[in-house]
């Protein structure tokens, strides 16, 4: 599975209009990744922006309602599902059914429509905040790690620096942007590809004819090159196209783990 957006228009309609139709493994993974990354961006936007400015938002005093995958609490599962669906973009961001949520460890803030889930493989998903609470990044990410969360994914941008700050430094996969399957409601905010707090390519290097160039020097290189991005992750990109792609708000999707 390498193209995140493949068949997006087709399978998003299948999800909404024909839920009984089983999606292929490829489509299912792509739809899941898109839903989770956009939801996390909504949740952690304020925290990430504060971090860019050298600040950190204070964490609110919260308690969780919990449901354990090994012994699901039906009432918590129902409330979590309602919480997940309570946002203005819920029809687009919500991916999981109640039966799927039952198989995860759920953490829902008491009295608020905000929480997160952890799958059996350690994937942190369904991060959402449809409440007035702010400053949840520190609590959510720390609590997720303390309860078995080991990996997550996101669109490159302001979340890169935030997730790195909380220990998700191992970049193990990248899905490059595909304009044909750009997600609905995307805001196309420009991403600074040369800022390490907003891009995995900021300190990327490429060896061309035995000379090592940094990403800034590669800006005009209009050819496919293998570069070493954050954490030494190797990926083939066209640097010139990638600069323009990020400039016009079309970042890649990054998969991280502890």
PLM feature spans:
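Acidic, proline-/serine-/threonine-rich low-complexity intrinsically disordered repeat tracts
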Residues: 20-22
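Intrinsically disordered, low-complexity, charge-dense segments enriched in Lys/Arg
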Residues: 203, 214, 221-258
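Short acidic, low-complexity intrinsically disordered linear motifs used
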Residues: 1-16
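Glycine-rich short-loop/terminal segments
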Residues: 24-146, 238, 243-246, 250-253
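A detector of low-complexity, intrinsically disordered, Ser/Thr/Gly/Pro/Ala-rich segments
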Residues: 10, 32-35, 203
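Acyl-donor binding region in acyl/amide transferases
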Residues: 112, 119-197, 205-226
């Amino acid at each position: 599975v390498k193209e995140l957006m493949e068949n997006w228009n087709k399978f998003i309609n299948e999800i909404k209009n024909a839920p009984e139709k089983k999606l292929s493994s490829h489509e299912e993974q792509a739809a899941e990744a898109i839903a989770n990354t956009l939801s996390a961006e909504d949740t952690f936007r304020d925290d990430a922006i504060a971090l860019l400015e050298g600040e950190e938002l204070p964490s609110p005093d919260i308690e969780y309602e919990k449901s354990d995958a090994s012994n699901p609490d039906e009432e918590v599962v129902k409330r979590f599902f309602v919480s997940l669906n309570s946002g203005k973009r819920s029809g687009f961001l919500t991916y999981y059914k109640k039966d799927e949520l039952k198989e995860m460890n759920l953490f829902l803030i008491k009295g608020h429509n905000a929480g997160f889930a952890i799958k059996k493989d350690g994937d942190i998903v369904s991060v959402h905040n449809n409440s007035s609470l702010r400053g949840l990044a520190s609590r959510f990410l720390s609590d997720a790690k303390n309860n078995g969360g080991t990996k997550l994914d996101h669109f490159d941008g302001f979340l890169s620096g935030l997730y790195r700050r909380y220990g998700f430094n191992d970049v193990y996969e990248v899905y490059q942007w595909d304009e044909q399957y750009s997600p609905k409601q995307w805001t196309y905010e420009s991403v600074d590809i040369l800022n390490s707090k907003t891009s995995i390519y900021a300190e990327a290097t490429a060896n061309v004819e035995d000379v090592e160039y940094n990403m800034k020097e590669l800006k005009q290189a209009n050819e496919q090159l293998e570069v070493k991005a954050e954490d030494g992750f190797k990926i083939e990109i066209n640097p010139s196209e990638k600069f323009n792609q990020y400039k016009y708000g079309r970042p890649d999707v990054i998969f991280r783990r502890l």
